[in-house]
């Protein structure tokens, strides 16, 4: 992301920011796990097992596939001497507790693979509960939407709202940055005023002052 007086972000990246800050989605107090209309397991889900957990949103399946969970972005674990982001290790431990030595169900996303070659999917436990929603409801990640993988977007937003309302996890003190504080790319929560919205062939862009 280029750094200038006007910062640009893709429409969906900006949508993540706006919804995280303004609370888009279901009203406060709704339990995402208890909402079958938004968090129910798709019929095409298939049984899988976890081999190992990389971080809060990525794991290795027993069949060798690397799985990136859809709809959640967890804090980054530090590498090459860099420190881990707050709650990164907590998110990893929580995912381990949910998936290790447990029968799981996997529903692939409409777009089933990312540019790193990882499988993209929705993961469910033996009771049919969304693993992503469970992590989000604990405040261990941010709900994100990247079309066309938006099947459980309402579920994930409801789960995040549950954590926000209770100020759980990273929502105890969310790291919201001003534009002047932004010094790197990647996922960030930003605050600013929308100056303009423009479009390109594959994306819309929001300029922030």
Located regions from the model:
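Small beta-barrel nucleic-acid-binding modules, primarily SNase/OB-fold domains
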Residues: 2-3, 22-209
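Positively charged N-terminal leader segments that act as targeting/secretion signals
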Residues: 4-17
